[in-house]
């Protein structure tokens, strides 16, 4: 029996009993895998895996993988971007905006433009949620007629 090391807790486990979401990635169980996905290494892995599948099969080489990883680490270490934020920005670019992925530009076609735009959207959404918590619900019932608005409870429009 061969032994492998859990990526999260670093315990040695039997390869046959290990949880493996994909080739050469082993964990004690699904709980270790979930915890690992929340770490920087796990989030970087998710980003690299997602971006890797955006490239055309002819461009999926080891040098392309290294280039993607270096770009991601640069944006993380130098620019201060978070891996989870980068992952969401790439998904936003591809799935929501439906932009075509250009193999020649790599992550540079998404960062920093869309990362910063998403960051602002998130901050606005967070501020709106906070504002909603502080506002109270109005008890006035409003019925919309064909030509005008009728407020019940005897309220005037003045």
Regions found by a protein language model. Name each.
Residues 1-46:
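N-terminal cysteine/histidine-rich coordination modules
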Residues 85-146:
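Short, cationic/aromatic linear interface patches
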Residues 23, 67, 109, 113:
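Short, well-structured alpha-helical interface segments that form or flank functional binding sites
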Residues 30-81, 148-158:
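Long, charged low-complexity interaction segments
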Residues 1-4, 8, 134-158:
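Short, Lys/Arg-enriched, disordered terminal segments
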